[in-house]
Amino acid sequence: VTKWDWEACMTVPENQWGYHKDWSLSYVKTPIEVIDRIVHAVSMGGNMVVNFGPQPDGDFRSEEKELAMALGCWMKRYGECIYGCDYAGWDKQDWGYYTRKGQEVYMVVFNRPYSGLLKVKVPKGTEIERAVLPDGQVVKVTETARNEYNVAMPSQDPGEPFIIKLQVKEASGATDGYRDALT
């Protein structure tokens, strides 16, 4: 994370910029991998450029078209966690990434824990007021310790990375209901 603007660029097949006739020489990224890299870049305050190499006739390979369609479908459902978002300033968790737009922090979940609970550590003085899915369904949030919460996952597995939008409140010099241990 840096205060300067930055951008990452990636190719769909590894190390093949522009058009290459033979894709068998390298690994071709899946839609989930490309989404992960885009979200990762935004979560660190950056931008991601995905390279598609047009064929000599100007058309794209069917694989690239399918990838673009998958990315477009995901962005249509969850693009609010990307467009206009930036670094959230929260510690990354094993389940995915955070992005932020104003007082809304987006949890972008790639890995569903078996417990069905997403552990969230918030910066000091930050409270989670509400958690909702993109369809407006409210998600249960339980404070478990100082600056730590459990956020329940939706019962239905969407089968793809999904988002939970957190509405947060930040207070300067706030005190909480916890007391430090006396030693």
Task: Show where each model-derived region lies.
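Mature catalytic domains of secreted/periplasmic carbohydrate-active enzymes
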Residues: 1-183
